[in-house]
Regions:
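Anion-binding alpha/beta catalytic cores of soluble intermediary-metabolism enzymes, centered on
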Residues: 1-251
Protein backbone atom coordinates (compact mmCIF):
# COMPACT_ATOMS: atom_id res chain seq x y z
CA UNK A 1 0.00 0.00 0.00
CA UNK A 2 2.79 2.42 0.92
CA UNK A 3 4.85 1.82 -2.22
CA UNK A 4 1.82 1.89 -4.50
CA UNK A 5 0.62 5.19 -2.99
CA UNK A 6 4.03 6.87 -3.19
CA UNK A 7 4.43 5.74 -6.81
CA UNK A 8 1.22 7.54 -7.76
CA UNK A 9 1.78 10.93 -6.13
CA UNK A 10 3.57 13.87 -7.72
CA UNK A 11 7.22 14.73 -7.05
CA UNK A 12 6.53 17.84 -4.95
CA UNK A 13 4.33 15.85 -2.56
CA UNK A 14 6.88 13.03 -2.32
CA UNK A 15 9.33 15.46 -0.73
CA UNK A 16 6.90 15.92 2.17
CA UNK A 17 6.34 12.22 2.86
CA UNK A 18 8.45 9.79 4.85
CA UNK A 19 7.99 6.28 6.23
CA UNK A 20 8.30 5.20 9.86
CA UNK A 21 9.50 1.62 10.26
CA UNK A 22 12.45 -0.74 10.15
CA UNK A 23 14.61 0.23 7.18
CA UNK A 24 15.86 -3.30 6.42
CA UNK A 25 12.36 -4.79 6.41
CA UNK A 26 11.01 -2.02 4.21
CA UNK A 27 13.95 -2.29 1.80
CA UNK A 28 13.44 -6.06 1.55
CA UNK A 29 9.71 -5.62 0.85
CA UNK A 30 10.48 -2.99 -1.79
CA UNK A 31 12.75 -5.44 -3.60
CA UNK A 32 10.31 -8.35 -3.35
CA UNK A 33 7.45 -6.25 -4.70
CA UNK A 34 9.67 -4.90 -7.50
CA UNK A 35 9.05 -1.19 -6.95
CA UNK A 36 11.63 1.23 -8.35
CA UNK A 37 11.85 3.66 -5.46
CA UNK A 38 14.99 5.02 -3.85
CA UNK A 39 14.99 4.72 -0.07
CA UNK A 40 17.13 6.63 2.40
CA UNK A 41 17.58 5.62 6.05
CA UNK A 42 17.35 8.47 8.55
CA UNK A 43 17.39 8.61 12.33
CA UNK A 44 16.15 12.19 12.66
CA UNK A 45 13.84 14.45 10.66
CA UNK A 46 16.74 16.84 10.06
CA UNK A 47 18.27 14.23 7.72
CA UNK A 48 15.64 14.53 4.97
CA UNK A 49 16.84 13.82 1.44
CA UNK A 50 15.43 13.86 -2.10
CA UNK A 51 14.77 10.12 -1.84
CA UNK A 52 11.98 8.35 0.08
CA UNK A 53 13.16 8.73 3.67
CA UNK A 54 12.61 5.97 6.22
CA UNK A 55 12.74 7.03 9.86
CA UNK A 56 14.40 3.88 11.11
CA UNK A 57 12.94 1.88 14.00
CA UNK A 58 15.91 -0.25 15.01
CA UNK A 59 14.44 -3.10 17.04
CA UNK A 60 11.79 -4.76 14.90
CA UNK A 61 11.80 -7.89 17.08
CA UNK A 62 9.86 -6.20 19.84
CA UNK A 63 6.29 -7.38 20.20
CA UNK A 64 5.07 -3.79 20.12
CA UNK A 65 6.95 -2.88 16.92
CA UNK A 66 3.82 -1.63 15.10
CA UNK A 67 2.62 0.28 18.15
CA UNK A 68 6.09 1.78 18.48
CA UNK A 69 5.80 3.14 14.92
CA UNK A 70 2.32 4.52 15.65
CA UNK A 71 3.45 6.08 18.92
CA UNK A 72 6.40 7.82 17.26
CA UNK A 73 4.13 9.20 14.52
CA UNK A 74 1.63 10.37 17.13
CA UNK A 75 4.37 12.01 19.20
CA UNK A 76 5.70 13.88 16.15
CA UNK A 77 2.19 15.11 15.36
CA UNK A 78 1.56 16.29 18.93
CA UNK A 79 4.86 18.19 18.85
CA UNK A 80 3.76 19.68 15.50
CA UNK A 81 6.84 18.35 13.73
CA UNK A 82 4.52 16.79 11.14
CA UNK A 83 1.09 17.82 9.85
CA UNK A 84 -0.38 14.36 10.32
CA UNK A 85 0.19 10.66 9.74
CA UNK A 86 -1.42 7.84 7.79
CA UNK A 87 -1.40 4.27 9.05
CA UNK A 88 -1.77 1.19 6.89
CA UNK A 89 -4.30 -1.52 7.87
CA UNK A 90 -3.48 -2.72 11.38
CA UNK A 91 -4.04 -6.19 12.85
CA UNK A 92 -6.17 -5.47 15.92
CA UNK A 93 -4.36 -8.24 17.81
CA UNK A 94 -1.61 -5.72 18.58
CA UNK A 95 -4.03 -4.02 20.98
CA UNK A 96 -4.43 -7.27 22.97
CA UNK A 97 -8.12 -6.63 23.51
CA UNK A 98 -7.53 -3.26 25.18
CA UNK A 99 -8.87 -1.26 22.25
CA UNK A 100 -11.41 -1.91 19.48
CA UNK A 101 -9.12 -0.34 16.89
CA UNK A 102 -6.95 2.62 15.92
CA UNK A 103 -9.71 5.16 16.56
CA UNK A 104 -10.00 4.16 20.21
CA UNK A 105 -6.22 3.83 20.64
CA UNK A 106 -5.58 7.36 19.36
CA UNK A 107 -8.46 8.64 21.50
CA UNK A 108 -6.85 7.19 24.63
CA UNK A 109 -3.49 8.76 23.79
CA UNK A 110 -5.18 12.15 23.48
CA UNK A 111 -7.21 11.84 26.70
CA UNK A 112 -10.39 11.91 24.62
CA UNK A 113 -11.88 8.52 25.47
CA UNK A 114 -15.51 8.05 24.41
CA UNK A 115 -15.29 11.27 22.40
CA UNK A 116 -13.51 9.70 19.43
CA UNK A 117 -15.04 9.92 15.96
CA UNK A 118 -14.37 7.55 13.09
CA UNK A 119 -15.15 9.47 9.91
CA UNK A 120 -14.98 7.69 6.57
CA UNK A 121 -14.27 10.52 4.15
CA UNK A 122 -14.93 11.01 0.47
CA UNK A 123 -15.09 14.53 -1.06
CA UNK A 124 -18.70 13.88 -2.08
CA UNK A 125 -19.89 12.45 1.24
CA UNK A 126 -18.59 11.26 4.59
CA UNK A 127 -20.14 8.85 7.09
CA UNK A 128 -19.73 8.51 10.85
CA UNK A 129 -20.97 5.58 12.97
CA UNK A 130 -22.00 6.69 16.47
CA UNK A 131 -20.75 3.37 17.81
CA UNK A 132 -17.64 1.85 16.23
CA UNK A 133 -16.45 -1.76 16.34
CA UNK A 134 -18.90 -3.31 18.78
CA UNK A 135 -21.30 -6.24 18.48
CA UNK A 136 -24.83 -5.51 17.30
CA UNK A 137 -26.33 -6.68 20.58
CA UNK A 138 -24.30 -3.97 22.35
CA UNK A 139 -25.39 -1.10 20.11
CA UNK A 140 -28.65 -0.16 21.85
CA UNK A 141 -27.03 0.13 25.27
CA UNK A 142 -24.33 2.36 23.77
CA UNK A 143 -26.73 4.98 22.43
CA UNK A 144 -27.62 7.94 24.61
CA UNK A 145 -28.61 11.57 24.26
CA UNK A 146 -25.29 12.60 25.79
CA UNK A 147 -23.23 10.50 23.36
CA UNK A 148 -25.10 11.87 20.34
CA UNK A 149 -24.56 15.42 21.58
CA UNK A 150 -20.84 14.93 22.26
CA UNK A 151 -20.10 13.17 18.97
CA UNK A 152 -22.01 15.50 16.66
CA UNK A 153 -20.74 18.64 18.41
CA UNK A 154 -17.18 17.37 18.03
CA UNK A 155 -17.79 16.28 14.43
CA UNK A 156 -19.13 19.73 13.53
CA UNK A 157 -16.12 21.45 15.13
CA UNK A 158 -13.41 19.27 13.60
CA UNK A 159 -15.04 19.14 10.15
CA UNK A 160 -15.05 22.96 10.04
CA UNK A 161 -11.41 23.04 11.13
CA UNK A 162 -10.34 20.52 8.49
CA UNK A 163 -12.39 21.60 5.48
CA UNK A 164 -13.10 25.27 6.27
CA UNK A 165 -16.87 25.14 5.95
CA UNK A 166 -19.83 24.23 8.13
CA UNK A 167 -21.08 20.71 7.36
CA UNK A 168 -24.65 19.71 6.65
CA UNK A 169 -25.18 16.65 8.84
CA UNK A 170 -27.87 13.99 8.35
CA UNK A 171 -28.64 11.61 11.22
CA UNK A 172 -30.17 8.16 10.78
CA UNK A 173 -32.53 6.47 13.20
CA UNK A 174 -31.68 3.12 14.73
CA UNK A 175 -34.82 1.09 14.04
CA UNK A 176 -36.63 0.18 10.81
CA UNK A 177 -38.75 3.19 9.80
CA UNK A 178 -37.60 4.86 13.03
CA UNK A 179 -39.96 2.49 14.91
CA UNK A 180 -42.72 4.77 13.61
CA UNK A 181 -41.69 7.03 16.49
CA UNK A 182 -42.81 4.60 19.19
CA UNK A 183 -42.57 6.38 22.56
CA UNK A 184 -40.14 3.77 23.89
CA UNK A 185 -37.86 3.85 20.84
CA UNK A 186 -34.30 5.18 20.75
CA UNK A 187 -35.47 7.75 18.23
CA UNK A 188 -37.97 9.32 20.66
CA UNK A 189 -35.90 8.89 23.83
CA UNK A 190 -32.47 9.95 22.56
CA UNK A 191 -32.09 10.93 18.91
CA UNK A 192 -34.88 13.49 18.45
CA UNK A 193 -34.17 15.33 21.74
CA UNK A 194 -30.46 15.44 20.88
CA UNK A 195 -31.16 16.88 17.43
CA UNK A 196 -33.36 19.60 18.92
CA UNK A 197 -30.57 20.63 21.28
CA UNK A 198 -27.98 20.56 18.49
CA UNK A 199 -30.14 22.77 16.26
CA UNK A 200 -30.40 25.26 19.11
CA UNK A 201 -26.59 25.31 19.13
CA UNK A 202 -26.69 26.43 15.47
CA UNK A 203 -25.40 23.08 14.20
CA UNK A 204 -26.76 22.25 10.73
CA UNK A 205 -28.27 18.86 11.51
CA UNK A 206 -31.35 17.03 10.22
CA UNK A 207 -33.15 13.77 10.95
CA UNK A 208 -33.70 11.18 12.09
CA UNK A 209 -34.00 9.59 8.66
CA UNK A 210 -34.99 6.02 7.98
CA UNK A 211 -31.78 4.23 6.98
CA UNK A 212 -33.37 1.91 4.41
CA UNK A 213 -34.35 4.74 2.07
CA UNK A 214 -31.80 7.42 2.80
CA UNK A 215 -28.89 6.55 0.52
CA UNK A 216 -30.12 7.71 -2.87
CA UNK A 217 -28.77 10.49 -5.07
CA UNK A 218 -31.28 13.16 -4.09
CA UNK A 219 -30.39 12.93 -0.41
CA UNK A 220 -26.66 12.54 -0.92
CA UNK A 221 -26.45 15.90 -2.69
CA UNK A 222 -28.00 17.66 0.31
CA UNK A 223 -25.54 16.59 3.00
CA UNK A 224 -21.80 16.45 3.68
CA UNK A 225 -21.89 13.89 6.50
CA UNK A 226 -24.25 11.08 7.46
CA UNK A 227 -24.21 9.92 11.09
CA UNK A 228 -25.52 6.40 11.69
CA UNK A 229 -26.08 4.55 14.93
CA UNK A 230 -23.78 1.62 14.18
CA UNK A 231 -20.90 0.56 11.93
CA UNK A 232 -22.58 -1.38 9.11
CA UNK A 233 -25.59 0.95 8.93
CA UNK A 234 -23.47 3.59 7.21
CA UNK A 235 -20.36 1.76 6.00
CA UNK A 236 -22.18 -0.86 3.93
CA UNK A 237 -24.04 1.61 1.67
CA UNK A 238 -21.06 3.97 1.64
CA UNK A 239 -18.64 1.32 0.37
CA UNK A 240 -21.22 0.15 -2.17
CA UNK A 241 -21.63 3.67 -3.56
CA UNK A 242 -17.99 4.77 -3.50
CA UNK A 243 -16.27 1.43 -4.09
CA UNK A 244 -13.71 1.88 -1.28
CA UNK A 245 -12.68 5.32 -2.60
CA UNK A 246 -12.34 6.81 0.87
CA UNK A 247 -10.07 7.28 3.84
CA UNK A 248 -10.72 6.72 7.54
CA UNK A 249 -10.03 9.90 9.52
CA UNK A 250 -9.88 9.84 13.32
CA UNK A 251 -11.29 13.06 14.77
Amino acid sequence: IIFKSISKINKSLKKKIFIIGNFNIIKKQLKELNYKLQLNKINDLSEFSKKIDVLNIKDNRKKNYILQCIDIAHDLAIKKKINGFINCPVDKKIFKGNFKGMTEYISKKNNAEKKEIMMIYNPSLSVVPLTTHIKLNKVTSNISLKKIMIKITSLNKHFKNLFKFKPKIAVLGLNPHNSEYDQNSEEVKYIIPALKKLKNMNINVAGPFSADSFFHKRNLKKYNVVVGMYHDQVLTPFKTIFNYDAINITL
